[in-house]
Amino acid sequence: MKIFSEQLVEEARVACHVADLATATIGEVLLVAQYLETKTGIPFIRMDQGSPGLPANHFGVEAEKAALERGVGSQYPPAAGVPELKEAASQFIKAFIDIDITPRACIPTTGSVAASFGAFIAATQRKTGQNRVLFIDPGFPIQKSQLRVLGIEWREFDIFPYRGQALRAKLEAELADGTIAAIVYSNPNNPAWICLEEEELHIIGQLATKYDAIVLEDLAYFCMDYRRDLGHPCQPPFVPTVARYTDNYVLMLSSSKIFSYAGQRMALACVSDALFDRQFPALAQRYHDTGVFGSTFIASILYMITSGCTASTQYGYAEMLRLAAEGKINFVEDTREYERRAHRMKRIFTAHGFHVVYNHDVTRPVGDGFFFTLGYPGMTGGELLKELLYYGVSSISLGTTGSQQQGIRACVSRMKPELYEVLDQRMRAFHEDHGDGREEERVKSERVKSEK
């Protein structure tokens, strides 16, 4: 039995100015869910927005307060970032990834969204004719929205059928015309929670070097592949990264998930030292500067977007990174609650006819973490998103992430202990209304009609 009527959901769609629920953005789904909650007082199971569901790390809070009390709020922050944060970032990267990036090339940004926005500009303007972006999907929809704002063309492909060595031929075909300036993916992946394995990262790195494309590696969910014993500073296993296989990279690290510091909008764009020092005549001509990638990226691009990052927050982030690198903060254990939530939620959904869409990496099953993907027999992703709204569950369609698979993205961050039973009841009702042969009959009926 539906909780929200079709009429009421349609009222919410119109009131929130959503063109089509099947292709609704994260923000649009959020507005519809909030409208229905406010209108009825009935709580939603919120699986839409990937906002942290844990308290902010208190070490960061205290360090930020101390910085404000020292008076840092009265001065503009350096465009390249405060030295304490740059040093801590370099130390953190060495401790957990085991690669060397000097502090000068670790650049604070106002969230990873600002990092990618600036990196898209720098990457696509550095060489004439090499001005497109390639997405290894599924991915974060906002990054393509950024390219729409910038007027940058892109190509994309769903990695689902191209895992392992199959990635090489596909990637080579996409890069062969020489127009791709940047390659983008997240690892672990938003939305699928798949993790690229070493052979895949090796392929990406080799081909990025061959075709001189810059890899933008989004590490927002750093060390959150809980299948591996990550998070021990200066001890293997280290975080997998393309940085072992190419010098053409920008690593995007965020405070939002690993330290639950999303409200302060703080991240890092960590550029390889080799790329940081490369000189590009096209950048020099456009910006009337030296054309050196790192300095142009900082002073001529990022500074024009945000004019630096909040000084006090930089000190808070620096403290969290420093303590983590010294082994005094175990941020992996702090975030492991997401693994427990995902495991429990998956059990509920799969007990009621759902299946996990992206369920395997190359050599093992996908783990439990911040996101997972769900499909239901006979339904497209857009149809499933819309149907779940009637049962008080909000999500986003995989179609909006560049996926070619049918299903939805589920985020676990807003799940609360008291809602598991509610979720179970609602999904039982959903399956009673859609499963047990009903969907098979509908598909069969539609097939017969089409044959006529």
PLM features: residue spans?
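PLP-dependent enzyme catalytic core of the Aspartate aminotransferase-like
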Residues: 2, 91, 95, 99-101, ...
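Conserved core segment of the aminotransferase class I/II
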Residues: 245-335
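A non-catalytic, amphipathic alpha-helix used as a structural packing/dimerization or gating element
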Residues: 28, 84, 88, 300, ...
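Conserved glycine-rich beta-strand-loop-beta hairpin in the small C-terminal domain of fold type I
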Residues: 311-314, 318, 331-346, 356-375
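Conserved core of the PLP fold type I
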Residues: 69-211, 216, 222-246, 250
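Short hydrophobic/aromatic beta-strand micro-patches
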Residues: 270, 373-375, 411-413
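N-terminal small-domain helix-loop-helix segment of the aminotransferase-like
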Residues: 2-9, 15-114, 165, 321-328, ...
